């Protein structure tokens, strides 16, 4: 199957390197999805300059006023868990947000519950004072 789609990526974060879409990610997608062409924007100016031709974008956020600059836009994908960073009322553009966060959040909550149930915070404090086991 040949996709024949150009996808515009603007996934940059100044503080969390893992949240950045790198050229190696783009090469991986192009290699494994026949016909896919990946374009990566490194800043908002570059993204807004390329937006008029885009049909599919992958972004952390999208401002509603950018929609007038995107006459060909059909899909917005975001890895973000919620939809609060992309607000499009009554738009023909389909928005799809990340749905993979559930297990990670559940594991974090269970870890926090066990931390307090097993009194790890108290044990740690005792160990610092040399009052506890260890």
Predicted regions and their residues:
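N-terminal glycine-/charge-rich "phosphate-binding" loop or analogous flexible N-terminal tail
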Residues: 1-54
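Phosphate/diphosphate ligand-binding glycine-rich loop within oxidoreductases
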Residues: 55-128
């Amino acid at each position: 199957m040949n996709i024949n789609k150009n996808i515009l990526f603007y996934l940059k974060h100044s503080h969390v390197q893992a949240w950045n879409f790198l050229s190696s990610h783009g090469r991986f997608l192009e290699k494994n999805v026949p016909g896919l062409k990946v374009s990566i924007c490194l800043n908002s100016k570059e993204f807004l300059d390329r937006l008029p031709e885009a049909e599919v974008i992958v972004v952390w956020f999208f401002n509603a006023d950018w929609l007038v600059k995107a006459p060909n836009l059909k899909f917005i994908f975001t890895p973000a868990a919620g939809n609060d960073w992309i607000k499009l009322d009554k738009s023909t553009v389909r928005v799809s947000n990340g749905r993979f966060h559930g297990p990670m959040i559940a594991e974090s909550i269970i870890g926090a519950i066990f931390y307090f149930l097993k009194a790890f915070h108290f044990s740690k404090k005792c160990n610092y004072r040399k009052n506890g086991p260890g």
